[in-house]
Amino acid sequence: VNGLLQLYGLCVLALFLKMLVISCYQGYFRLRYRAFANVEDAAFVGRAVMAQDLPQVRRAARAWANDLENIPLFFVLGALAIALQTPDDVTGLLFCAFTVARAIHTLTYLGGWQPWRSLAYGVGLACLLVLAAMIGKALL
């Protein structure tokens, strides 16, 4: 397996696991407090429906939504970078930096820690922009 492809695969796997953890985090708080916003879920545990989700669940849902705005872009740009054979060293560094930045972003989002959340978001965004520029250069 190509070294860069292997690194990309590891980053994709790490991001998948990170997103899975956010789902489990939400589920943990829903189950712990038996607090559900869906009628069928509340009925299943013999509780009334909550007017709104718990604060921890809402925050995790926002972190998840932010992931859905950024991580698919990484999947596409990363695959294109490999296919277009952008420089391995820089591309690999960007893959790792993006993955670490997204993990830090999630932790700081769940903890409500500014300015660290914005800094982590900015690092991840910068990685995407540099990947896009490298792809553009490879195409021209």
Question: How would you label these PLM feature ranges?
Answer:
Residues 1-25:
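Long, highly hydrophobic alpha-helical transmembrane signal-anchor segments
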Residues 16-33, 103-107:
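Transmembrane alpha-helical segments that form the membrane-embedded catalytic/substrate-channel core
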Residues 24-62:
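Cytosolic, membrane-interface loops and tails of multi-pass inner-membrane proteins
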Residues 65-80:
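Core segments of transmembrane alpha-helices
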Residues 79-83, 103-107, 136:
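Alpha-helical transmembrane segments of multipass membrane proteins
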Residues 88-97:
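Structural signature of hydrophobic alpha-helical transmembrane segments
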Residues 103-127:
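Interfacial loop-to-transmembrane junctions
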Residues 131-140:
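Juxtamembrane boundary at the C-terminal end of a transmembrane helix
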